[in-house]
Amino acid sequence: MNSALARRVEELQKFKSDFFGRVRELIKGRKEIRIVGDRFVFQSEVLFKVGSEELGIKGQEEMAKLAITLMDIEKSLPTDIDWILQIDGHTDNLPVKKGQDYLDNWELSTKRALSVLRFLIKQGIKPDRLSASGYGSFQPIDKKNTSIARAKNRRIEMKITQSTKTNQ
């Protein structure tokens, strides 16, 4: 049993490595999309208009490329490898303006992550391979109170990880 589990973990690692390698080629030389540790970081300005949860044209193009890469690599994976693409939305620390469609940054970050998730499903990614979370302004990557720091903190992060579903 342990050898089977070790094999699945090894295959998931290979999948992650292949995926990262292919996406790295897609984003080569682009500052607004980067790899940080085991995550892809897309700046919100690439994907969304300011204060909006809807993917813009450029955001749709980027997510379509990502979906094609993910589906292509998934074809070579054994079917018993349980993985998910975790999509995390983050905002800056400025409050949502009055009159906007969001109560707060928690809601905006969550709706942005869900917007990416739903777009990927429309592109053919299986829903059970996706998960979305919103963190509002509470996990900044730059804690300075400057416009540059706020721009860095407005982002979507994606990570391939092992699924937590259990076989019951």
Located regions from the model:
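Extracellular/lumenal/periplasmic "stalk" regions immediately C-terminal to a signal peptide or transmembrane helix
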Residues: 1-34
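Periplasmic OmpA-like peptidoglycan-binding domain that tethers envelope proteins to the cell wall
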Residues: 2, 6, 13, 17, ...
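C-terminal targeting/interaction modules of large eukaryotic coiled-coil scaffolds and adaptor proteins
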Residues: 20, 24, 35-43, 168
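Conserved helix-loop functional segments at active or binding sites
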Residues: 25, 29-32, 72-76, 122
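Short, charged, surface-exposed interaction patches
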Residues: 32, 36-46, 78-82, 89, ...
